[in-house]
Amino acid sequence: MNIILMGPPGAGKGTQAELLKARFPIPHISTGDIFRDAVNQGSELGQEAQKYMSSGQLVPDEITTAIVKERITQADCDSGFLLDGFPRTTDQAQALDQSLAELGKKVDLAINIDVPTQLLIERLSGRISCRECKRVYNLNFNPPREQGKCDSCGGELVQRNDDRGETVVKRLEVYNQQTRPLLQYYEAQGVLFNIEGSRGSGQVFADIQEKLESL
């Protein structure tokens, strides 16, 4: 099964991706991870992407799509994949569909985790993570046992620059402008599954699991 995981920043995509990966035998493909892998491996596509990334520019769609396509052709994706962080625009979605069609595949389900804007702001502005092991906490909903210290490894807890104040609001605005149209795109294909993400992660996952097992 080929799954797209969608939702605004702070919706809990990372948590659901980990739960899905543990339950279903398909790889979790994060575009951030495969960009880093391509760059570290020194592949031709990775070198092209690095030129843009190092100068602070967005990587063009054709390079991003090619890197994603290269990843989903690997053997561990034969039974499906969970794609997180791509596509972000309808142009990217169309390019992905074309790449999948060339491989005799298609998107089976696009999961959209929907969360009210005010709750997203609270989640993001309270989000901190461990500098060492990258475990994520939330000062409002899931604080560490000891202030400033990771429960898992004792590392220092820090807040990302893009999880602060006005930056959070801007990130959500960009998401709404660029990514919201994707919902209409996948709805037209009959593969969109909207889920209320303001509940606990266990409840959200239970609904996603029920949907996947019904397909």
Swiss-Prot record:
ATP binds at residues 10-15, 127, 136-137, 199. Consists of three domains, a large central CORE domain and two small peripheral domains, NMPbind and LID, which undergo movements during catalysis. The LID domain closes over the site of phosphoryl transfer upon ATP binding. Assembling and dissambling the active center during each catalytic cycle provides an effective means to prevent ATP hydrolysis. Some bacteria have evolved a zinc-coordinating structure that stabilizes the LID domain. Residues 30-59 are annotated as: NMP. The gene is adk. It comes from the Bacteria. Pathway: Purine metabolism; AMP biosynthesis via salvage pathway; AMP from ADP: step 1/1. This is Adenylate kinase. Zn(2+) binds at residues 130, 133, 150, 153. Residues 126-163 are annotated as: LID. Catalyzes the reversible transfer of the terminal phosphate group between ATP and AMP. Plays an important role in cellular energy homeostasis and in adenine nucleotide metabolism. NCBIfam families: adk, PRK00279.1-2, PRK00279.1-3, PRK14527.1. Pfam families: ADK, ADK_lid. HAMAP family: Adenylate_kinase_Adk. PROSITE patterns: ADENYLATE_KINASE. Monomer.
